[in-house]
A protein has these predicted regions:
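Short, Lys/Arg-rich, polar N-terminal cytosolic tail immediately upstream
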Residues: 1-15
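A structural signal for multi-pass alpha-helical bundles of membrane permease subunits
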Residues: 15-305
Length: 305
């Protein structure tokens, strides 16, 4: 009896193990096929000269050396991307926080506005929205029409002007503030109302409450949003490709767009792979810097004095 019970238990355990492997199998296959193997392959290709038509030729560090010594457009793309990140990320986070604080109020219309404000985050990366944005900022677009109606004469093409083209991409990025806004809103609702009541009793006004209570207690959420938005900012691609295609005069040639051109425009897969690894390194360094600095500005509830 004991042996049969033990055998049945072992058989059941074995069946559960097999079912576990069966359920994890599709994820594992996808992970290996679309993440792990391409990850390793791109690292290997970064040391080769490969154009997809012939076998890869090992060139050592030649791709990396060329990037920093001979390719002027590489440095241009890097500069444009840094400028984009420095402009777009703080503005998007500030705008998202302001809207989140407005939507924190109890109102029957708040759920409706949450959906409306979140829609750009879903639609903003689509081709249709990018084409619409291109029309809005064109010479005969909606923006110039509105400015002319207000008596401000404007007939410039915002996306073709080297001084304003990057700002058109920045504004589109800011417009997609729904995701960080919802995260901020969730964090704001976790702050106890008793803190604000105590501050009011002490005579603290709204600005003082914001800087002494809201901002410190929201700093972990700000930290999370900053990291996620920074990573997304460094990888911005589709909007730049569809709206400006890197122009005018490479003023909107972001890093990911230049990487795409090298890899799939000029078929320099080895060079493109090397660029991808440099981008990964840049994102890793900046993420590490944010993590290292977090001890100085990220506070938790038990640290607030």
């Amino acid at each position: 009896m004991k042996r049969s019970a033990g055998s049945a238990l072992a058989a059941r355990q074995q069946l559960q193990n097999r079912m576990g492997y069966l359920f994890i199998g599709p994820w594992l296959i996808c992970f290996l096929s679309f993440t792990a193997i391409p990850f390793v392959a791109s690292f290997a290709l970064s040391f080769t000269d490969y154009n997809m038509l012939s076998a890869p030729v090992f060139v050592g560090l030649a791709n990396y050396i060329r990037m920093f010594t001979k390719d002027r457009l590489f440095m241009t793309a890097l500069t444009v991307t840094f400028k984009f990140v420095l402009l777009a990320i703080p503005l998007r986070l500030c705008f998202a926080l302001v809207v989140a604080m407005i939507l924190k109020r109890d109102s029957k219309a708040v759920p409706f506005y949450r959906v409306i404000y979140y829609l750009p985050s879903i639609l903003g990366g689509s081709v249709a929205v990018s084409v619409m944005w291109r029309y809005v900022f064109s010479k005969t677009g909606v923006l110039n029409t509105a400015l002319n109606a207000l008596g401000i004469m404007s007939n410039i093409s915002w996306i073709s002007n080297k001084d304003t083209a990057l700002w058109s991409l920045v504004l589109l990025f800011i417009w997609q503030f729904g995701s960080p806004m919802l995260i901020f809103l969730s964090g704001l609702k976790q702050i106890p109302a008793s803190y604000y009541e105590a501050a009011e009793c002490d005579g603290a006004g709204k600005p003082r409450q914001f800087f002494a209570i809201t901002l410190p207690l929201l700093s972990p959420i700000i930290f999370f949003n900053l990291v996620m938005q920074m990573i997304g900012g460094f990888m911005v691609f589709s909007q730049a490709m569809i709206i400006t295609d890197g122009g005018p005069m490479n003023k909107t040639l972001v890093y990911a767009l230049y990487l795409y051109r090298q890899s799939f425009g000029y078929y320099k897969m080895g060079y493109g792979s090397a660029m991808a690894w440099i981008l990964l390194l840049i994102i890793g360094v900046f993420t590490l810097l944010v993590f290292k600095s977090s001890s100085a500005w990220v506070f938790y509830e038990n640290q607030i004095k």
